Amino acid sequence: MKLSNKSQALYDMIAPAVEACGVDLWGIEFLPQGKRSLLRIYIDRPVDENAEPVINEDGEVEQGRGIGVEDCVRVTQQVGAMLDVHDPISGEYALEVSSPGWDRPFFQLEQLQGYIGQQVALRLIAAVENRRKFQAKLLAVDLENEEIQVEVEGKHVLDIDSNNIDKANLIYQD
């Protein structure tokens, strides 16, 4: 679950601009695609259902809200202007800003801690038990040893090194 050097450099550059917009930088994906690359930024705001209602700039009452379109627009403008000045991406690129959504991708091991007991989809770099793809229940996150523990098909438990995780997503369930 490590970012490439290019993605890490972009993350470090973008993070202050995103946080200045009052939201958290959940993660980024930088996808070189021939002549036109894609920079996808995921932003989030923890939903606090116990928070006091707040009146926003439009005079509307908000209670522990997540990310809205206006947040994405604000971050797009802020980050877009910064990228235009610093120009860290050679060639043309598209900038996308969105919430992580129901099937949120995970970019850091720490992010998984809030989802223990839930189903996740994993794509591994090296096969474990002759498989690279799993849908499993997340049982534990061990930050010290940098691994997760999952239950596969309700049958057996696997310990997976976080450096072997190519991609991890939440599986949304009602």
Curated annotation (Swiss-Prot):
InterPro entries in alphabetical order: Ribosome_maturation_RimP, RimP_C, RimP_C_sf, RimP_N, RimP_N_sf
Protein's cellular compartments: Cytoplasm
Gene Ontology CC, one term: cytosol
Principal subcellular localisation of the protein: cytoplasm
Superkingdom of the organism of origin: Bacteria
A GO BP annotation: ribosomal small subunit assembly
Alphabetized UniProt keyword annotations: Cytoplasm, Ribosome biogenesis
Record keyword Cytoplasm present: yes
NCBIfam families: PRK14631.1 (NF011224)
HAMAP family according to UniProt: RimP
Family: Belongs to the RimP family.
Job of this protein: Required for maturation of 30S ribosomal subunits.
Protein's recorded name: Ribosome maturation factor RimP
Protein source organism: Acinetobacter baumannii (strain ATCC 17978 / DSM 105126 / CIP 53.77 / LMG 1025 / NCDC KC755 / 5377)
GN (gene name): rimP
